[in-house]
Amino acid sequence: MFCVQCEQTIRTPAGNGCSYAQGMCGKTAETSDLQDLLIAALQGLSAWAVKAREYGIINHDVDSFAPRAFFSTLTNVNFDSPRIVGYAREAIALREALKAQCLAVDANARVDNPMADLQLVSDDPGELQRQAAEFTPNKDKAAIGENILGLRLLCLYGLKGAAAYMEHAHVLGQYDNDIYAQYHKIMAWLGTWPADMNALLECSMEIGQMNFKVMSILDAGETGKYGHPTPTQVNVKATAGKCILISGHDLKDLYNLLEQTEGTGVNVYTHGEMLPAHGYPELRKFKHLVGNYGSGWQNQQVEFARFPGPIVMTSNCIIDPTVGAYDDRIWTRSIVGWPGVRHLDGDDFSAVIAQAQQMAGFPYSEIPHLITVGFGRQTLLDAADTLIDLVSREKLRHIFLLGGCDGARGERHYFTDFATSVPDDCLILTLACGKYRFNKLEFGDIEGLPRLVDAGQCNDAYSAIILAVTLAEKLGCGVNDLPLSLVLSWFEQKAIVILLTLLSLGVKNIVTGPTAPGFLTPDLLAVLNEKFGLRSITTVEEDMKQLLSA
């Protein structure tokens, strides 16, 4: 096992990365190794998808499957080894069918890629795990060095984050064949074990630029189906009655669940990254969408154990449900998996609803505590002139984008302290689950404009980017000249690709924490600092002083 893709990874003087029987996330060595094997199979599939396009062959089943299966290897998504093997077998079957289509056009069709003809050696997990050793990401570390390995992983993990957003968009009927072509090209190239530093750096920026397009179509899918989010108050306390909790990012799953629970007497609560759903008109119209429950994903083993109903996980993040003994009432959807947990293959939630009706639910309603969400792209753009007016009248000094992933490290209290230290004449724009560090606190307003503005999920960084570009255009300056600072927390691969997206668009002087990714060496961090001004957090006092004086 070698996995260094998330912030929890083991860090020692001898090197970084989980490499024993089980990773810090709870992923076993077997599952981790089989995910390496799946990635190799997907690289071979992408190599043939690139070749097929040379013959004008575009297979949508291949294009949609590839990023979806890649998504299953993201942190805290799928811990179920048999399903990982199933994805690998499906990748190989799709590859062989695509290869046959190419050979039907050109009998001499060939692909020069070490993954292009990969076959699984056995049905036995142990044999497959031994085969996977050929594809361990650090297998040639001694030959290439830590810097090249780090850049490869930056690209691989960044592309994995983009693949997740591609799948989220596809669920909503949004895709782009040019994006698929670019994805396959990059994925296939990474399967050749590239070792050119400049080429890898260029690839990381290409991934960022591609992801901006992915976020654009995802935004179109969400707003096209469910309307533009508008500011909405959400209750974060319990309401009496039977209940279901839904977590993750998949708004379509939430919509289907709301439709199927309407009139049943079962209330629905959002959790984690599903919180922004309350801002969408076509979702909040369901009166039994009663509120948001819990906090950051890392607290789920306590909070889910206390929730008196079933839980549905639609995407990341799931962690071991046996710890809180709720594994008999947590359900997985789509690419999510945990051994022994019931999985929903389709859009029918009747079994979940039946379980909710058999459970006690909340016995009484707590005193409501309301927070505000729903500052989506259109709402932010509508506020652009107001922001400019406040700046011109010196009522608004600075905007801090304070967002990203949450996690368990104690150092993450930095983000709570930073938020509460932001001066009263400054605004906090937040997104992703890092907001749970401070989103239930009171921040007041500036002439009626809330000082805490919740822009949505991690992918809604797109909205923040569009706002920044719009403000810069209206003020006749560059984005980096705005009174705007980005202080981002990271945990996994979606955060990595958001960072690459921002860097690829030329955004500079981003501050990140609580730690640097374990796969980035001091040399690579120095390059990113020199090229983009990217740096790690220090103390709240020092960072606040520096950012306000920039």
UniProtKB/Swiss-Prot annotation:
Xref: InterPro entries: HCP/CODH, Hydroxylam_reduct, Prismane-like_a/b-sand, Prismane-like_sf, Prismane_a-bundle
Residues bearing Cysteine persulfide are: 405
Function per UniProt: Catalyzes the reduction of hydroxylamine to form NH(3) and H(2)O.
Q: Name one GO molecular function term.
A: peroxidase activity
Q: Where in the cell is it found?
A: Cytoplasm
Please give the family membership noted in the entry. Belongs to the HCP family.
Q: Which Pfam families match?
A: Prismane (PF03063)
What does the note accompanying the cofactor annotation read?
Binds 1 [2Fe-2S] cluster.
Record-listed [2Fe-2S] cluster binding positions: 3, 6, 18, 25
Q: Which Gene Ontology cellular-component terms appear in the entry? A: cytoplasm
Cofactor dependency: [2Fe-2S] cluster; hybrid [4Fe-2O-2S] cluster
EC number, as in UniProt: 1.7.99.1
Record's catalysed reaction(s): A + NH4(+) + H2O = hydroxylamine + AH2 + H(+)
Name the keywords, alphabetized.
2Fe-2S, Cytoplasm, Iron, Iron-sulfur, Metal-binding, Oxidoreductase
Q: What is the lineage of its organism?
A: Bacteria, Pseudomonadati, Pseudomonadota, Gammaproteobacteria, Enterobacterales
Question: What protein does this entry describe?
Answer: Hydroxylamine reductase
Positions contributing to hybrid [4Fe-2O-2S] cluster binding:
249, 273, 317, 405, 433, 458, 492, 494
Its BP terms in the Gene Ontology are: response to hydrogen peroxide
Q: Is Membrane among this UniProt entry's keywords?
A: no
**Which superkingdom does the taxonomy of this entry point to?**
Bacteria
